[in-house]
Regions:
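Partner-binding and oligomerization surfaces adjacent to conserved cores of proteins
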Residues: 1-146
Length: 146
């Protein structure tokens, strides 16, 4: 079961359509393992994806002046976060096909937020969240953290 978090927004309508774009090898892995592949957030191609904005990082550094372990915790946090990215849209997206499939070989899985919520099997070792990514200006905007 996924957990709720006040800082992680989720569309209210459980029938919100989501898409997962996969190349053939990732789809075959899904079929054989019966598990979704989760990417570590420190392995994303986009260097800003899954990181703190500059204003937030500066705040973390100030807090860490008297507690160096605090900064190290936040730096290592990306290695411990795994993500399965889905795209919210009523229709397929040509851009998503281009990004997530190789050599025009791949497929798209259509589901809904509600079906994903019901499909998440409780994990005892890890906290699980489902939420919508909020893209921001990483140079200017502050990201709340606890």
């Amino acid at each position: 079961m996924y957990l709720n978090n006040k800082n992680i927004k989720l569309p209210e309508d459980p029938d919100t359509i989501v898409w997962k774009y996969l190349d053939l090898s990732k789809f075959l892995d899904l079929l054989m393992s019966k598990k979704l592949f989760m990417s570590r957030s420190d392995k994303f191609e986009d260097q800003y994806e899954g990181t703190f904005s500059e204003p937030t990082y500066e705040e973390i550094k100030r807090i860490a002046e008297n507690n160096p372990e605090f900064l190290q915790y936040y730096k290592s946090h990306r290695e411990k976060v795994a993500v399965s990215s889905w795209h919210i849209n009523e229709y397929e997206s040509f851009a998503m096909w281009q990004i997530f499939t190789q050599n025009s070989e791949g497929l798209a899985i259509q589901s809904t937020i509600g079906r994903l919520q019901n499909a998440v099997i409780p994990e005892k070792k890890y906290d699980q969240y489902i939420g919508e990514v909020n893209y921001i200006d990483y140079k200017k905007e502050h990201i709340p953290f606890e």
